[in-house]
């Protein structure tokens, strides 16, 4: 009896056990994927590792790229290996992100559009597949938008999902804007000669070499200068040439044959001492026109007096000025010359630079900046052009004998000018420029010392900073543009100074990229190195000047010309009014009582 009951229960127990085990297996198969999904998103499930692109090797992809990325860091052509499918999928799945990154679209508008148009219709999928399956020759905006009019007739067109982001790839060629350098032309205009003996706005500096070394300045203006007291020492007329500040040239060059003055020689009772005139220290360079050569004889002092048309008898005031830096050698041999009759004398006139008054005898010569420091003698800074003496011949009633055959200041200046150049030994280029001021006009247009090629490029392929070849996201209208200036003549001197050359500079950019060897990585951002600008780099600067920490040179003479004084005063008044108004507006009143009822 008992055995029979056990025999009956055993099949039932076996069935229950089998069913329980089956249910446990079903629960395990359902619970394992859920538990794995709870740890995070598996990127391997979102890509197709067995796809066509993943099976292609690195060599095949590099061969499919139309540019040699081993020679250059980018390629602006897509080629057949560009992953259009991954780029389109990323743009389609991140419409809000792309619109916020590339346009002025509010985030709430993007969210509203995504919520309302979150429907995925089979028609959209078929239309998109048909659109991108057509050949490239039939792709056009007119062909792609031919069904839009039919869709507008639908009642639910307002909520109809339109994939405007999925547009055709829009290729834009690389800009070929080149910066060409033009040769500056030189135009010279000569002012008419001044014939009259009375000159306006041109002061005559009378250097009086008395034993006390004092100088007096006589300003000649339409009047008769009374005769000064006769002195045994010599006197020389020095005309100060003053260029025009209103001209548009970089430098003002005064022609040596446009200004003439008339002077009358006066007999000298005794021979004067030998005088060596040295220019003022503020001019920077040495006075090349008045230095006497050691191999030549000392110059002969001449005596001259300024004359003018007798129109009035009002005496002109004489003001004392700080004596110039002069040296007198007392031990030098004296020149015994007694002039009994009026003779024709020659006075050496020095060109004074860095003056701001107007002179009708100035000649405007616009030249290029590079030609100013050329080593040839034909340049503007050649010693012959800089310190060429202006000679003025005084005409008298009767000719007489010439001065002694000794060396003259003109001959000595020519010898010294031919031996010394613009830059002294051990002198920096910036120091010479600081001593020799350049009157830069505001309306001149400069050129780059290193010519560049300006480009705006949206590359498809590029090498990142680790040397990996990546595809950049470049789908219209979400291209990633890079603007750079490339040297047209790299490692060449061009317009740089000696010892310098043009070199390309680079800059890092962070761009969205795609790795064709790892589709599971998706779209990510990486660093890329692209050209930025072209600079002029010098290598012959001494180490002592490199090591010293100096503030940057800022000379106001190289800056833009200052504004008119009246305009500057008006601007100062406006600024004072504005400061006063803001101070009264923002500052609380002192008499305000916070405890007032």
Swiss-Prot record:
Domain Spaetzle residues, every copy: 448-538
InterPro entries assigned: Cystine-knot_cytokine, Spaetzle, Spz/Toll_ligand-like
Gene3D superfamilies listed in its UniProt record: Cystine-knot cytokines (2.10.90.10)
Region (Disordered): 179-235, 289-340, 390-419
Keyword Glycoprotein: yes
One Gene Ontology biological process: central nervous system formation
Protein's UniProt keywords contain Ion transport: no
Disulfide bridge positions per record: 450-502, 487-534, 496-536
Low complexity biased stretches: 179-199, 391-419
Signal peptide bounds: 1-31
Keywords assigned by UniProt, alphabetized: Coiled coil, Disulfide bond, Glycoprotein, Immunity, Signal
Inducing or repressing factors: Transiently down-regulated by microbial infection.
UniProt biased composition (Polar residues): 206-223, 290-315, 325-335
Stretches assigned to coiled coil: 107-135
Residues that carry a glycan: 215, 287, 354, 463
An annotated Gene Ontology molecular function: growth factor activity
Record-level GO cellular component terms: extracellular region; extracellular space
Subunit-level organization: Homodimer; disulfide-linked.
Miscellaneous comment text of the record: 'Spaetzle' means 'noodles' in German.
Record's protein name: Protein spaetzle 4
Species of the source: Drosophila melanogaster
